[in-house]
Every structure is written in structure tokens, then in C-alpha cells.
């Protein structure tokens, strides 16, 4: 269920432990939503890129991971290889769903995987990820920038909300907490929009009792960092609320340090030889240029 849910949202969850991974110490994400053209553009900056494994050079596994990002449609969301959009994984998941349907192994209602396939195909057509450049930040650490463009935003959100309701109906998201289950069932009856995007504000609302919320094993440090960057995580009116951005803002910025560990300068040499490092790259100027160009294309 988790895989299906996150696939619909365009996000992969990777739970397998990784003893030798490419990591980044800080991420800055700036997004601008264009409601009239139903488009979202995102500027991604990853700073302090390095290999987590031992040694002064990247391991074969880390090199393979780096290659997969540069050659594929992948972008990350504040958790180093845990939350990401992976175009290759989405393609494979579509193939797996088609195989299930062909073999008659789709669970319960075949309409659900068919709808999911259609949504994922639309997502594939709607998203573009461009790897801009490797560069060195002010601390001399290996860093990189990406540009992401997502079209048909409202269709993706509508599909995600409908899919969440369908999962509640078939019992995939049942809660042990009795009152939370009541709230979930009522949200289906009321056709609650769990995910909304208004102006530059992204909001997620999930039915949950106050008791259930208090029992959640949430990393307080992560919440603190998220709120410091302007986000909100709270429980109110029978729901968990996660919110970032303001409706009338020009755009929304989320910048978080993901690690306080000592930086390992073990990736720059390989990247310089394999891909090149733009030592004159100015991320602030490049970001401004990206949004100017986006305004010209999508602002109406």
C-alpha cells in the first residue's frame, strides 16, 4: 500500500538500509506555483555532497548511485535517498501494474490499478527534471543544482486525493485508534481534499485523533527544522496538518540542514573528472534566471 500511495504522488520511499550512500548535508528547495497554467516549478540545491562510506574516494556503489541521478529523472526531498521522485522506478511500477492486470492478480477491484496506471502515465508526461551543474559552495564543498517542472498540477492532486479516499474505503489505511478510524470514514463521506495547493501554499490534512497524534513517533528535530524554515506541523480539529508557504507569496522556500556530521570531501575529485565542476557557477543568479524564464513561460 505504501508503495502504491507514494508512487501516485510521484515519490518513492526506500526503506532498505544503505551503508555506503551518496549524501548531502543541506538542501534548499524553492518552488513557484502558477495556478492559471497549472504548473509548478522547483529549484533544488544540494550542498555538501559526499560519500558516506569509509575512505577518501567514492565506493563503486556510491559512483553507481551518482550516475543514476545524472542519467535519470530523479529529484530528492530532504531525506537523502529516502523520499525521492525516480522516473525509472515509476516506469517499472507501471509495468508491474500492467502485469498484475494481465495475470488477473490485481487486488479486489481492477479499476484501482487502471486508474493508478493512467495517473502515473500522466505524471511521466508532465514532469521534467534538468540537472543544472555541479559547483562548490561558499565553504568549498561539492554542491549541485536541479530544475524541476511539473505540469497538470491540479490533475495530479485530484488523482492523489481520490486514490487516498479509495484506499480508506477498501481498508488499506485502517487505523488502530477507533476515533481516528471514525474520522477517516467521515472524510470519505465528505470527500475531503487531503492535499491542497492554493497560491504558493501547499497543505496536507490527514484525519487523526489527538491521542493518535501524541503517539506518533515523530522526530522532534525534523519538526523543529521544518518550522524554522516557515513550515507548520500541528494537530487541530481532528486532523494532522502539515503546511508550507503563504498563498500570496511570490514563491516558497524550504531550506534545511540534514546533517551536522563532519563533511567528507571524497566526491569532488570523481565528479570533476567524470562530469566537471563549474567553479564560476553562481547559484543565486542561476536561480533568479530560472524563475524569470519560468515567469515568461507560465505566468499569465
Please tell me what each predicted stretch does:
Residues 18-21:
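N-terminal Sec signal peptide cleavage junction
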Residues 1-9:
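Bacterial N-terminal signal peptides that target proteins for export
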Residues 9-15:
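Gram-negative bacterial Sec-dependent N-terminal signal peptides
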Residues 79-300:
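Mature, soluble, non-transmembrane domains
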Residues 24-116:
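N-terminal Sec/ER secretory leader and immediately downstream segment
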Residues 6, 25, 131:
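Sparse, context-dependent recognition of short Cys/His-centered cofactor- or disulfide-binding micro-motifs
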Amino acid at each position: 500500500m505504501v508503495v502504491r500511495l507514494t508512487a501516485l504522488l510521484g515519490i518513492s520511499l526506500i526503506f532498505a538500509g544503505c551503508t555506503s550512500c551518496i549524501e548531502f548535508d543541506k538542501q534548499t528547495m524553492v518552488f513557484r506555483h502558477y495556478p492559471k497554467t497549472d504548473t509548478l516549478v522547483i529549484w533544488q540545491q544540494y550542498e555538501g555532497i559526499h560519500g558516506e562510506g569509509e575512505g577518501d574516494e567514492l565506493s563503486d556503489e556510491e559512483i553507481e548511485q551518482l550516475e543514476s541521478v545524472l542519467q535519470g529523472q530523479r529529484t530528492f526531498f530532504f531525506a537523502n535517498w529516502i523520499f525521492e521522485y525516480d522516473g525509472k522506478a515509476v516506469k517499472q511500477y507501471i509495468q508491474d501494474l500492467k502485469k498484475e492486470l494481465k495475470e488477473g492478480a490485481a487486488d479486489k477491484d481492477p479499476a484501482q490499478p487502471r486508474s493508478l496506471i493512467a495517473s502515473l502515465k500522466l505524471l511521466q508526461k508532465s514532469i521534467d527534471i534538468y540537472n543544472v551543474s555541479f559547483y562548490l559552495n561558499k565553504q568549498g564543498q561539492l554542491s549541485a543544482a536541479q530544475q524541476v517542472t511539473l505540469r497538470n498540477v491540479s490533475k495530479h492532486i485530484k488523482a492523489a486525493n481520490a486514490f487516498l479516499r479509495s484506499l480508506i474505503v477498501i481498508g488499506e489505511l485502517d487505523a488502530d485508534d477507533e476515533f481516528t478510524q471514525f474520522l477517516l470514514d467521515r472524510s470519505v463521506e465528505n470527500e475531503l481534499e487531503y492535499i491542497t495547493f492554493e497560491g504558493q501554499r501547499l497543505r496536507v490534512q490527514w484525519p487523526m485523533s489527538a491521542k493518535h497524534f501524541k503517539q506518533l513517533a515523530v522526530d522532534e528535530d525534523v519538526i523543529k527544522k521544518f518550522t524554522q524554515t516557515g513550515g507548520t506541523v500541528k494537530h487541530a480539529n481532528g486532523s494532522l496538518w502539515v503546511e508550507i508557504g503563504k498563498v500570496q507569496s511570490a514563491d516558497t522556500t524550504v531550506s534545511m540542514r540534514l546533517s551536522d556530521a563532519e563533511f567528507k570531501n571524497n566526491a569532488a575529485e570523481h565528479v570533476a573528472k567524470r562530469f566537471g565542476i563549474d567553479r564560476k557557477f553562481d547559484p543565486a543568479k542561476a536561480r533568479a534566471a530560472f524563475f524569470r524564464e519560468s515567469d515568461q513561460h507560465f505566468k499569465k
